[in-house]
């Protein structure tokens, strides 16, 4: 998986450089928006280095997802390299897509969904409600504005997970909770996605999603 991450990061920088070469950005200054997700942080910082080597002045703008799309639609940010489509960020694209241009695909085999340790004996989201006591009736998530959180709200409704609370936190807090639970051999369910190093460090699996709430494979786009 690591080699695909590297290819994606390099490709994002190349796409951005090609776009800038055909644009009329004033004074060659580019504003790159990014959220606090590892792949987005890596792609944005590498793109900054590549663009600066080609004479561009680059400003990195860190924000939550909703403000990023507002900023993109208002032309206060020029580029976002971490748009997960067609499902995860669909609501944002439906709202702001008319004012956003696609630069290209960065990574074509991304996936999002609910993730558990391999030792957890259930295989499907449809089994969660019957096992809510094992999971302390919690799905551990990330920041509230993230696309995966919006989709998980839809999954809770679609699968009748009325006994669960979707816990808002951050990526780092979620991963700390995952490690703590796995060290104790406890059951835990989190909002997860690939590419992400958690699948290299921990023995994890996606729960099957027979209703396809999370869709199939996602694509990461530069916009």
Protein language model regions, located:
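C-terminal motif of bacterial Sec signal peptides marking the signal peptidase cleavage site
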Residues: 15-19
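Short, well-ordered beta-strand elements
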Residues: 26-39, 56-61, 136-140
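Short helix-initiation/N-cap motifs at beta->coil->alpha
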Residues: 37-38, 59-71, 166-177
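Pocket-flanking alpha-helical
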Residues: 44, 64-97, 176-177, 197-203
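Ligand-binding cleft/hinge of the Venus flytrap
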Residues: 47-55, 130-166
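Ligand-binding pocket segment of bilobal, Venus flytrap-like solute-binding proteins
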Residues: 77-81, 151-212
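Periplasmic-binding protein-like
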Residues: 106-113, 198-223
């Amino acid at each position: 998986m690591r080699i695909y991450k590297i290819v994606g990061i390099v490709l994002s920088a190349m796409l951005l450089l090609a776009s800038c070469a055909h644009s009329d950005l004033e004074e060659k200054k580019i504003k790159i928006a990014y959220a606090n997700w590892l792949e987005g942080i890596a792609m944005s910082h590498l793109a900054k280095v590549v663009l600066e080597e080609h004479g561009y002045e680059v400003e990195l703008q860190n924000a939550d997802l909703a403000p990023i799309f507002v900023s993109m639609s208002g032309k206060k940010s020029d580029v976002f390299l971490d748009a997960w489509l067609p499902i995860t960020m669909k609501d944002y694209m439906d709202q702001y897509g008319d004012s956003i241009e696609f630069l290209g695909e960065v990574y074509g085999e991304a996936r999002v969904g609910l993730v558990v340790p391999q030792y957890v004996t259930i295989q499907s989201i449809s089994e969660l409600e019957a096992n809510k006591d094992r999971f302390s009736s919690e799905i551990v998530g990330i920041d509230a504005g993230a696309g995966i959180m919006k989709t998980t709200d839809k999954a809770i409704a679609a699968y009748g997970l009325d006994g669960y609370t979707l816990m808002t936190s951050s990526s780092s807090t979620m991963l700390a909770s995952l490690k703590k639970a796995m060290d104790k051999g406890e059951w835990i369910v989190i909002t997860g996605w690939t590419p992400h190093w958690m699948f290299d460090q921990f023995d994890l699996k996606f729960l099957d999603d027979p209703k396809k709430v999370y869709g199939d494979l996602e694509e990461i786009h530069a916009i």
